[in-house]
Amino acid sequence: MPLPLPVLGSWRHAYASLQPAVTRGSSRLPVAALDLLIVGLTLAVLWLLWTRRATVRVLPLAIAVVVIAALGWLLFLTLWGWNYQVPTLEARLDLKPSELAAGPGETFARATVAQLNALHDEAHASAWPSRADLPRVLGPVMARTLPTLGIAATPLWPVPRRTMLDWYFRAAGIDGMTNPFGLEILLNSRVLPLELPALAAHEYAHLAGFADEADASVVAWLACQSGSPALRYSSALAVLPHLLTGLPRQTQRAVIDGVGKGPRRDLRAIAARLAEQRPWVHAFAWQTYDRFLRANRVAEGVARYDAVARVLIGAADPATGTLRRSPRPWPPSH
């Protein structure tokens, strides 16, 4: 359901104004809003089927299901989903093919490895931020980063919550999600402390209106790179696999050989956590999400996760942790 540009711009302003109230409300609930929604809908369906079991007709039931699904989709779009229609940072940065060659990609990957090696001891010297600490720790760096990307309003940052779907998150290899119906952040309970800052910043970027997965990862990297050694280290760990994906196999091995013992242990710990996933559940989850993204006009589907490498290689400076140029303003001025 594409919106005309003026309407989409007005909706974005309305979203920025309403997000703090919706997030504040969901944060006051005793459990995740998504859990309450799932339980409530399940009980309502069971109750209706039971009370009307003698008069259930297939056609009216099918029509009711379609109507409820359509209303749910419209609610999704209204609360958050129209953010998918905003041009991505990749499009707004007007990246050139010469900026995305293997040479710059290898340079950025090696710089990321060098940062991991340099920051490892300092990042591990003190305790990693807890989930309860994340709004306080990430709030200032997000507030510095968002205006440079065209977001004037500062969202309300909630404490990431656990969900009753945690077993599914672990089996499917899902690290976290933003609940569009409650504008809350839900994270996998098994995510390692050193992964939390970058992961939470990624989900906070979604709350700020960056629906695109690559955009959210770019925002998370930029925000964390302006923070403490722990934040910079976490963000470097998060983007390294994406940076390696686009490199030739021999170059990948050469870059990985440069990873020091400390960061190598951390990467192995992350790999061990991800090994807990069940392949068939992971395949089902990612195929479903791929269809969802394509339904929202994201042509690459889940491959958009790796597009973060294109944006960083083409427009970011690994030495300063900033973009070399600003993205085109959106909505465009007239």
Question: What role is predicted for each listed range?
Answer:
Residues 29-32, 101-124:
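Short extracytoplasmic
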Residues 1-51:
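Membrane-embedded alpha-helical segments of integral membrane proteins
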Residues 30, 196-222:
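Active-site recognition of the HExxH zinc-binding catalytic motif
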Residues 261-334:
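Pan-zinc metallopeptidase signature
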Residues 105, 112, 211-253:
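Post-HExxH zinc-binding segment in Zn-dependent metallohydrolases
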Residues 43-50, 55-90:
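Transmembrane alpha-helices and immediately adjacent membrane-cytoplasm interface residues
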Residues 123-189, 193:
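Auxiliary, metal-adjacent structural segments of Zn-dependent hydrolase domains
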Residues 7, 11, 81-104:
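Alpha-helical transmembrane signal-anchor/signal-peptide segments
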